[in-house]
Design a protein with these regions (language model features):
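Alpha-helical residues within the helix-turn-helix
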Residues: 27, 44
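Amphipathic alpha-helical dimerization/coiled-coil segments
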Residues: 73-104
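Short, cationic-aromatic polyanion-contact patches
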Residues: 1-6, 21, 52-76
């Protein structure tokens, strides 16, 4: 499953803290409130999160965002893929610097 970077960032945030409101996510990630809402709905439709309504939540957030087992699995796969991409980029940059140093 291909997931957008924005969706991955939201998965990471709610995995750390399911009590974050949409406004909290918007503020912490630098996304518009509409974008956060759209991403959460998309993640819900893909079966990666569950959205529970808790009106008596002490921090007055009406919703609790919970990663499903599928969401946790997908987040893990994406994290691994992201790390592999970063390692590859690091190796490429390291080789470029090495080549540049040899030329000078």
């Amino acid at each position: 499953m291909k997931i957008k970077r924005e969706h991955f960032n939201i998965l990471r945030k709610i995995h750390k803290n399911a009590n974050l409101s949409q406004r909290d996510l918007s503020s912490q990630l630098g996304y518009s409130l509409g974008k956060v809402n759209y991403c959460l709905e998309s993640l819900k439709q893909k079966g990666l999160i569950k959205i529970n309504n808790f009106r008596k939540n002490p921090n007055k957030s009406n919703y609790l965002y919970i990663l499903t087992p599928r969401g946790i699995s997908e987040k893990t796969k994406i994290t691994l893929r992201f790390m592999q991409e970063r390692i590859k980029e690091y190796d490429e940059l390291k080789n470029e610097l090495s080549t540049h140093k040899k030329k000078n």
